[in-house]
Amino acid sequence: DTARSRGLGDVYKRQDGDYAGQKSGQIVGWMSIKPIIMHVIVMDDSNIKSVTDLKGKRVGMGQPGGTSMLDADFLMRTAGLEPGKDFKDFRVKLPAMVDMLGNGQLDALIWNGSPPMPPVIKLKSQHKVRILDIPRDLSAKIRKASPAYTEGDLPANTYADQPNEVMSFRLGNVLLIKSSVPEDIVYQATKAVMENLDFMGTVHPAWKKVSKDGIINGFTIPLHPGALRYYREAGVPGIEAFAKSVGQ
């Protein structure tokens, strides 16, 4: 009964694609976690210097159904490269892409995730690779086309042998929940997560940057009443202004 999404407005209003014609408000917000950042990775000795250099190359795009694959498609199409036409696209999971890049089956891999990502750490420990800059003009086009994306760079030294900041863009990483889930269940679940963030950080690194201060960042749709109740009790900064802005 939970989900992740890129286009919050589309999910909430049910107005586009698979959501068209469905009743609005069935999916609502729960909590915001660490934003995910786009990575475009090539071998260090490759002559690929930019996204546009991927024309005619073999590119790992992520597995079907994953949000990272959607983001990779969006990036490449915005750069003017059509999957299957301008380059050969491979739809596989990140660990498989890491192996394929390392053994020469891919020229590049694209993944949108919360850094530092363990498969990328593994890749850099075994091979010399580079993370490509995504130029400001390209990221600006992406952000203009979809407000779900925001400007965000990969900080220097996120990975070994990465002394410089890498220009990129990011996507708010939010958890959604069905509005039909009982309020008290969501309240208790929210309370359990928020009061055990140290433990959650041992489960996945994305939780290490989660805090009360940023728990509603990136939301433009109503929150589940159970989550809203807890955030009010916990004194989440800006919660009343946010609730008013979405009519809660």
Sequence positions of predicted segments:
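Short, solvent-exposed loop/turn segments at the edges of secondary structure
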Residues: 33-37, 169-170
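Bilobed "Venus flytrap"/periplasmic-binding protein-like clamshell domains
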Residues: 35-103, 213, 217, 221-226
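Pocket-lining segment of extracytoplasmic ligand-binding domains
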Residues: 16-17, 83-181
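Single conserved hydrophobic/aromatic residue that forms the stacking wall/gate
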Residues: 1-8, 12
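Short, solvent-exposed loop/beta-turn-alpha elements that line the ligand-binding surface or hinge
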Residues: 19-24, 217
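Ligand-binding clefts/hinges and TM-proximal coupling segments of bilobed small-molecule sensing domains
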Residues: 64-74, 148-210, 216-219
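Short beta-strand-centered segments that line the small-molecule binding cleft or hinge
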Residues: 13, 26-32
